[in-house]
Amino acid sequence: MKSEDVKLGIERAPHRSLLRALGLNTESFQKPFIGIVNSFTEVVPGHIHLRQISEAVKEGINAAGGVGFEFNTIAVCDGIAMNHAGMKYSLPSREIIANTVEIMAMAHAFDGLVFIPNCDKVVPGMLMAACRLNIPSIFVSGGPMLAGRLRKNDQVSCVDLNSVFEAVGQVAKGQMTEEELLELEKVACPGCGSCAGMFTANTMNCLTEALGMALPGNGTIPAVDSRRTQLAKSAGQQIMQLIKDNICPKDIITPDAIHNAFSLDVALGGSTNSVLHVMAVAHEAGADFSLEQINRISDCTPNLCKLRPSGPYHIENLDQSGGIGSVLKELKPWLKNDARTVSGKTIGQLADAAPKADNKVIRFASNPYSPKGGLAVLFGNLAPNGSVVKRSAVAPEMMVHRGPARIFDSEELATKAIMGGKIKPGDVLVIRYEGPKGGPGMREMLTPTSLLAGMGLDKEVALITDGRFSGATRGAAMGHVSPEAAACGPIAALQDGDMINIDIHNYKLSVELSDEEIQKRLANVPVFEPKIKSGYLKFYTENVTSASTGAVFKD
């Protein structure tokens, strides 16, 4: 056992003395040491309840003959960090999470790890750490929030955080009063858990099942459901079996597992952020995978779900309809069914054991919402290295669009123009210098897209950015444009009025300029000057790579 480095031999007497100070006895030193990586915090609704999850994990570890040690890492609530300086820190927190877990696990010689994430950057940060450390590991997330209930005119409707973001645009346009907004604000987030739609956090928690790193139910069992606590106890027990069998993350997260994750992703219509995060996990796992492969998967994999923001259903509905297992059951012809999982069974075996889909929340593969998956990576002279769009959330009339560019060099300037009524039907908003280096931190453009949707412009206006989008975004929103403006990508050459062509069906994103004209303009673009010159974001700017490779740090 790795923990023998701190337990065995006379030279480890000081180590044992310190461990005895924790309450351990001689018998404890014969057992595996398990690190419990908790991301509990009192400021994030998705993490406020994770102490209860951790206690259940400890019970499982103890019952199976191990010793659990809980430690914490950071967690950012993207909703609270949205639309101010805090959003610059959200994506960069992913690397901090991975690094802090690495430090704790290596410093204390754990034999295995149980990860307890829930929200957006915590899941991929922990997955990256698991691959980097490559010791037996298992994930159990905190679970999704229930949808809120809004009563209006004797009618009750299901609402969520995205409802509030879009309502701001409705208020700005005079379609909703501030009093009505307040009533919505009060009920949209009714308790603990990750925000209730197929937004980034829930996308990543669901994909963790498809990657093979979590037990069935991880992605969909609500945070307040007793089955979540039972799942946590089972995860604590299962880590002991993984240690016994010496099954490590890199045995599980292979190119086949990445294939399965993206297959599930496009079937669910998951967040575009998943592309960034799964590519980063693949990098840490040494699993070679390209953006072009995502398009090949999406071309042949049906879109089976219309979950918020793409449709009316929430994660609780997905859970009631069979959960991720039922989606995987429909996807079996497109999966790598022999891929291993932490359960000890293959992904195909788990799919076989799942209940049949209901053909409502989870459509049959023979009756999909679309024969093609929910994500697409667009290429062209505007995005030579790719740009990601959630096509399942794009209105049919915007799948192909041609319009004049409206250029903004920050989210704030674009937001001001939208609120001021300066964006017209047919326009293509371009928000640049918001990429990994340019932002820095690749902020989410949820406020601009929510305003457009709330104003009813999401079927008439497209938005292109080298920044990111929230999983709650809907509309013709192309993000992750690579190379970014700060790296002198073609997006930096655009000027107001340039005609932009979007063809999602054929994976194309281009501007009606010759290569010569683009290069001529780029030659006159000033050298990018970093916006932040101190602290962690200075380090981040100097070391982060392109969104096309997951915005990981330089090797």
Swiss-Prot record:
The protein's matches in Pfam families, at most eight in alphabetical order, are given as: ILV_EDD_C, ILVD_EDD_N
Q: Does the keyword Transferase apply?
A: no
Extract the InterPro entries matched here.
Dihydro-acid_dehy_C, DihydroxyA_deHydtase, DiOHA_6PGluconate_deHydtase_CS, ILV_EDD_C, ILV_EDD_N, IlvD/EDD_N
Q: Which reaction does it catalyse?
A: (2R)-2,3-dihydroxy-3-methylbutanoate = 3-methyl-2-oxobutanoate + H2O; (2R,3R)-2,3-dihydroxy-3-methylpentanoate = (S)-3-methyl-2-oxopentanoate + H2O
Which GO cellular component terms, listed alphabetically, does the Swiss-Prot or TrEMBL entry include? cytosol
Q: Which residues bind [2Fe-2S] cluster?
A: C119, C195
Report the coiled-coil segments: none
Q: Which family does it belong to?
A: Belongs to the IlvD/Edd family.
Name used for this protein in its record:
Dihydroxy-acid dehydratase
Organism of provenance: Dehalococcoides mccartyi (strain CBDB1)
